[in-house]
Curated annotation (Swiss-Prot):
During stationary phase, converts 70S ribosomes to an inactive dimeric form (100S ribosomes). Pfam families: RMF. Its main location: cytoplasm. Residues 1-24 are annotated as: Disordered. GO terms for cellular component: cytoplasm. InterPro entries: Ribosome_modulation_factor, RMF_sf. It comes from Colwellia psychrerythraea (strain 34H / ATCC BAA-681) (Vibrio psychroerythus). This is Ribosome modulation factor 2. GO terms for biological process: regulation of translation. Belongs to the ribosome modulation factor family. It is found in: Cytoplasm. Keywords: Cytoplasm, Translation regulation.
Length: 57
C-alpha cells in the first residue's frame, strides 16, 4: 500500500517549525503563496514559542 504525502499546507507548517527550531528568521520564509506562507509562519511562531518555553535548545 502506498503512503500518502501530507498536504502542502501541513508540510509548510512543519517546515516552518523546523526552520524556527533551527534559528532562521521569519524573513527567510521560502513560500510566495499566501496560504503556504501563513502556515509556514504559524509553524515558525510555534517553534519560537516552544524554544522560549525551554522545550528545545
Amino acid at each position: 500500500m502506498k503512503r500518502q504525502k501530507r498536504d502542502k499546507l501541513g508540510r509548510a507548517h512543519s517546515n516552518g517549525y523546523q526552520a524556527g527550531l533551527g534559528g532562521k528568521t521569519k524573513e527567510q520564509c521560502p513560500y510566495q503563496n499566501i496560504d503556504a506562507k501563513s502556515q509556514w509562519l504559524g509553524g515558525w511562531r510555534d517553534a519560537i514559542s516552544d524554544r522560549n518555553l525551554g522545550l528545545f535548545k
